[in-house]
Amino acid sequence: MIFHLALAADWDAAVPAGEYRVSTLGRTLEEEGFIHASADLGQARGVAGRNYGHVTEPLVLLEIDEDRLGCPVRLEVPEGADEAFPHIYGPIPVAAVTAVTPFSH
């Protein structure tokens, strides 16, 4: 399992479309080239603290089954980081999301 922090409104819009295409705050899969993810809950909390502290809209944590994605997932170390993060190189099918949990930071 891997995790992705999402605006609840972005996830709600993805459900009827059948797939989620938001990479990170304000950027789409097409703009970024991949969807940012976290390898575990601790990593997701770190991402929230660094990047989502100013966000006032409701957030959800998506739990994603990599085997259901149908696209590559690569562990990569972003520039300026000291740990690897899973990057999802395609849209996330709604069926690949096994849990959606409200997230507060």
PLM region descriptions:
Residues 1-105:
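Conserved, structured core segments of small domains
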